[in-house]
């Protein structure tokens, strides 16, 4: 199976965009843009996401225990792009403030289990609390572009 063609096939599935954020210290965070976010269970509230084992950011996230998931709105393309190539930001920076202000929702989570499947590390996490921010259009990724 040709990996490039397989990736093209999978790109035909429209997904939302989320950002995983975990604290480094009281001043800064690590963050990464993902489209692998999924709800697993409503009761108890479990979610999942996955991380490419060959990603340059793998070491920043492989052992996280607590993290937040921000579900992005259509207004947040620049933030999505920023955290696709940058992983660190100051906690009080404009990019983090805009992430918090304009996201559709925030879920605060704790990692329950991690599994390695193929070339990805799969995280299963319990949602500890959540906040619904707004009712605007989501940021959608389809066929390699935002919609």
Predicted regions and their residues:
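Basic, polyanion-binding surface patches
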Residues: 1-147
